Amino acid sequence: MTIAERIERLPLGRFHRRFIALVSLGNFFDLYDIFIVAYIGAALQQSGFLTLRQFTLFVAAGFLGMFVGTVVFGMGSDRMGRRSAFILLLLIYSVFTFADAFAPTAAWLIALRFFAGMGIGAEIVVIDTYVTEVVPGRARGRYVAITQVAGFCAVPVAAVLSRLLVPTHFLMSGWRWVMVIGASGALLTWWFRRRLPESPRWLESRGRLAEADAIMSGLETESFSKEGKRIYTDGTESAEDTEKKESGSFWELWRRPYLSRTVMLVIFQALQTIGFYGFANWAPTFLLKRGVSLLHSLEYTMLIAVVSPIGPLLAAWTSDRMERKWTIVVLALLVAGLGLGFGNSIAPAAVVGFGALLTLANYWFSAAFHAYQAEMFPTRLRATGVGFTYSWSRLSAAFTSILIGAVLVHGVPTVFAMLAVAMILVATVVGVMGPRTNGLVLEEISR
């Protein structure tokens, strides 16, 4: 019996809940750090610590770091393992974010943000890969979405903390405390790392069948203890024996059947981040440019942020019921339309209303595609494929920050027209090139 068959036959229970809780905690602090940029950014500019140009570089540095981290560590987790990568990246992120909180100058703030970004970007890739491999296919989309629910709960938390702390000064500026809290929480998550197992699918793909069997035996014993039985196996054979025994090669991404998926995901990732982070990282700055005060911009974005977990919750409910491919297409078009509404809103009620709906659609979209992208490649290539294609979103986000800074002089509506075009192209490429994945075992999708 293969590792895949043993994973698929496990009942969903205590192990899966514990595993998802620990991984979700890591995702919470990852997304907390990504989204605090929007909330502290307005304060950094108003206080004079950063100019608009320097804020643009600050945002770009974080995404460039994510690009490098995704390429080096995200793809590297195919060699070092999912658990090892998850632990290492949490440590990198927390140490450099903590140091960034005490940056004495704008140059230090920007430089340290780059190194913190290395941990943040790759961690997201590893989480998607890790969960996809450990959870049975019947719940894969739902459980990936749950990690996103936990992650996006960080958005209202970051917004509320920023609203409370940014205007204050206790020993140091309030925005520094917002960063310290995130780094401290990530270190706490790192402390709980001992309870995470390595991915049995990854161990199998590396030929470490005895270790994979030992982990699965432990999970089976725990999962079936209440029934007083465990799955009976006659030894573990490798599912990848029917594919390739050796480690996957980067160049395999450019051969059939993975070529079209690689091209589709590269285009998708390069474009989706324009629409997603164009709003998420710049909303308070857009409001400042509209003449809204710092305090009111933080209040508006705090109200908008309250709905953040609802999008991933909807994804958790629909992910295994609705085909993920078409969910992504519909939501991309919805984000485009709502973005145009937000960009042309002036009245506070319209700003908050369109902003809340846009946030809900954006984060539902995010949860759906995180489950989808990790299904595209076999275990031996999964982190390499996801890491390489996802890295384009980080590179795109870095240049998008610079582009938005330049386009913003022509007005907020112009920026959102640009974002809408990007999301329409996203819907087109997924609709035309994306495969269907719902209800299939990973090994079936990867053939």
Show the residue positions of the predicted features:
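Transmembrane-helix signature of 12-pass secondary carriers
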Residues: 1-447
